[in-house]
């Protein structure tokens, strides 16, 4: 199982989204909420209250 790159939630097989940047770094997201917060809004996970530690 993969974990979300933003909230560290486990992602089940066949769900979620993989985002690959031009530099080759790979991010896995469990929801569009996590994807938008990290990619579009540029938020840091440790500063967001709803993210698991």
From Swiss-Prot:
Its cofactor is Zn(2+). One of its GO terms (biological process) is translation. Belongs to the eukaryotic ribosomal protein eL24 family. Binds 1 zinc ion per subunit. It comes from Methanobrevibacter smithii (strain ATCC 35061 / DSM 861 / OCM 144 / PS). GO terms for molecular function: rRNA binding; structural constituent of ribosome; zinc ion binding. Signal peptide: none annotated. The gene is rpl24e. A zinc finger (C4-type) spans 4-34. Disulfide bonds: none annotated. GO terms for cellular component: ribonucleoprotein complex; ribosome. Binds to the 23S rRNA. This is Large ribosomal subunit protein eL24. Keywords: Metal-binding, Ribonucleoprotein, Ribosomal protein, RNA-binding, rRNA-binding, Zinc, Zinc-finger. The keyword Metal-binding applies. Pfam families: Ribosomal_L24e. Zn(2+) binds at residues 4, 7, 30, 34. SUPFAM superfamilies: Glucocorticoid receptor-like (DNA-binding domain). Gene3D superfamilies: Ribosomal protein L24e (2.30.170.20). The keyword Metal-binding applies. Part of the 50S ribosomal subunit. Forms a cluster with proteins L3 and L14.
